[in-house]
Amino acid sequence: MHPALLRHHDRQRSGKGSSCRRFQEKPIPREDIRRVVDLARFSPSWKNTQPVRYVVVDDPVLKERIARECIPGQGFNTKTINRAAALAVVTYIPGLSGQGDAPLTEVQAAGWEMFDAGIAAQTFCLAARELDIGTCILGIFDAD
């Protein structure tokens, strides 16, 4: 097992690997964000198509607007977004997963981008944890 995953496993067993909802009030260095995204972008995906994209938002006004307009009525998650130093929005390119695998893609493609995005989100969290950056995956998405 990779040493980073072993350290994560040890944290999980000790209760220190859970989601973080109370963040320090200090910015995350851009270089650290780049490192986390760089590691996460190489997460496994169907046919190695890499359909996942990241948008990192650290502007407080924009984070507040996202919290207000994208997740109305979810007060707890709104507070989590506003307290975080940065918000990483995980997106994907529809129809890209498995591209080039024609027979399978036509039959099984629906939803695989979400699967690939989940793998990438977990890799993102593991990479962030190694830099002592707390994360919290919010299960909020636009189905359209």
Residue map of PLM features:
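Acidic, surface-exposed loops and disordered segments
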Residues: 1-144
